UniProtKB/Swiss-Prot annotation:
InterPro entries, sorted: ATP_synth_csu_bac/chlpt, ATP_synth_F0_csu, ATP_synth_F0_csu_DDCD_BS, ATP_synth_F0_csu_sf, ATPase_proteolipid_c-like_dom, F/V-ATP_Csub_sf
Keywords per UniProt: ATP synthesis, Cell inner membrane, Cell membrane, CF(0), Hydrogen ion transport, Ion transport, Lipid-binding, Membrane, Transmembrane, Transmembrane helix, Transport
GO terms under cellular component: plasma membrane; proton-transporting ATP synthase complex; proton-transporting two-sector ATPase complex, proton-transporting domain
Pfam families for the chain: ATP-synt_C
Topological category with respect to the lipid bilayer: Multi-pass membrane protein
Subunit structure: F-type ATPases have 2 components, F(1) - the catalytic core - and F(0) - the membrane proton channel. F(1) has five subunits: alpha(3), beta(3), gamma(1), delta(1), epsilon(1). F(0) has three main subunits: a(1), b(2) and c(10-14). The alpha and beta chains form an alternating ring which encloses part of the gamma chain. F(1) is attached to F(0) by a central stalk formed by the gamma and epsilon chains, while a peripheral stalk is formed by the delta and b chains.
Protein known as: ATP synthase subunit c
Length: 84
């Protein structure tokens, strides 16, 4: 039973690491493209900023969903019931 709990914690940690890495890469690409497009067409900067914040919220949602799934696996582990 301890091996299942250990594997679940390691899996949840890997899930959180990949979600954080993906979110960081997404924010970096988003910020770079926003600055590039704002420099190219400054008159569209306010419209682009609104769209950038919407996409940033969606990117952040990916990490929050990963946190929720990890907490589910850590505290309400569905795999332990298979052992009993």
């Amino acid at each position: 039973m301890e091996s299942v709990i250990t594997a679940t914690i390691i899996g949840a940690s890997i899930l959180l690491a990949f979600a954080a890495l993906g979110t960081a890469i997404g924010f970096a690409i988003l910020g770079g493209k926003f600055l590039e497009s704002s420099a190219r067409q400054p008159e569209l900067a306010s419209s682009l900023q609104t769209k950038m914040f919407i996409v940033a919220g969606l990117l952040d949602a990916i990490a929050m969903i990963a946190v929720g799934i990890s907490l589910l696996f850590i505290f309400a582990n569905p795999f332990i019931s298979l052992l009993q």
